[in-house]
Amino acid sequence: MEIQLINIGFGNIVSANRVVAIVSPESAPIKRIITDARDRGQLIDATYGRRTRAVIITDSSHVILSAIQPETVANRFVISRDHQTVDN
């Protein structure tokens, strides 16, 4: 199994294999997930002080905040998957 990485903005990269969901931060349930992760010490803020536009949830229950749109992250995720398929 090859490690796939996704750029989530500002030079920050996450492992594509660990991503469970990429969501928008506006809904109340997602805001609760962010608050709970902060309380557990499992919140990673990769926004560099900018507005949070995407919330990435991993299989290890870490929550990553990104300043780029969820659609952009998802497109990078799909492109990463497509490159692996073509290479194999």
From Swiss-Prot:
Top-level lineage group: Bacteria
Taxonomic lineage of the native organism: Bacteria, Bacillati, Cyanobacteriota, Cyanophyceae, Nostocales
Any Pfam family: RemA-like
InterPro entries tied to this protein: RemA-like
Alphabetized PANTHER family for the sequence: REGULATORY PROTEIN SSL2874-RELATED, REGULATORY PROTEIN TM_1690-RELATED
Species, as recorded: Nostoc punctiforme (strain ATCC 29133 / PCC 73102)
HAMAP family, per the entry: RemA
Protein name (record): Putative regulatory protein Npun_R3866
Similarity comment: Belongs to the RemA family.
